[in-house]
Amino acid sequence: MGINLAADSRVFIIEGISGSGKDTFQTYLKEQLEGPHLYDYSEGEVLHSWKHLQIEGILKLRIKFMKLFVNYVSDIVSRDENAVFLLNRFHLSAYVSTIIQQPKLKREYDDIINVLRTLPIHVFILQLDENEIEERSLHPERSSAWQKHQQQIVNKEGFRDRLERYLWQQGLMLEAAERQQIPYSVIKFPCALENGTRIASWT
């Protein structure tokens, strides 16, 4: 599976459910795009870490931050023709985790989407087959606090188990991506790297 992006794509967003390989794919893309004008952001740096979710008011704060952030990205990209942004989670994760939970934030969210549509952007949606989700989403290397948090979320949101929740999230992300009409690719990861994914280079 080869992917060759046009050189005018300068904002890259990696999306996908927990366990889909976002961190690994971000590391790979960072190696391909490495340079003095690369702005690289982890999920925590864009307020999408699981550690934020139990903070009261975080969903509203996240949307406010995202509005400021997209304007910042737009400004940098317009002023520096060599600037490239690489984000781990952003608008699709926000839709699944924030807008579905608090629909009253949708107007501000739509403002974010409108700015994203004006940018030279490409979104990678990492997708897992149903039989991969259970194994890859376990994250045995993560702390007991993370494991406990995941179970609390499953119970709070009324899902039968983690698999049901992640299948729902994955489908919702794809629906939102199609509706929002922001350029995107669906990638079966890690198979994509094994089969030679390639990113166009910049000069």
Where are these predicted regions, by residue range?
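ATP-binding Walker
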Residues: 20
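Walker A/P-loop
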Residues: 23
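Glycine-rich phosphate-binding loop used to anchor ATP phosphates in small-molecule kinases
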Residues: 62-118
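P-loop (Walker A) phosphate-binding loop of NTP-binding proteins
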Residues: 17
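Conserved substrate/cofactor phosphate-moiety recognition/catalytic segment
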Residues: 27-79, 98-99
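A glycine- and Lys/Arg-enriched "phosphate-lid" helix/loop adjacent to the NTP-binding pocket
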Residues: 114-169
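Hydrophobic anchor at the beta1->P-loop junction of P-loop NTPases
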Residues: 14
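NTP-dependent small-molecule kinase module
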Residues: 2, 162-203
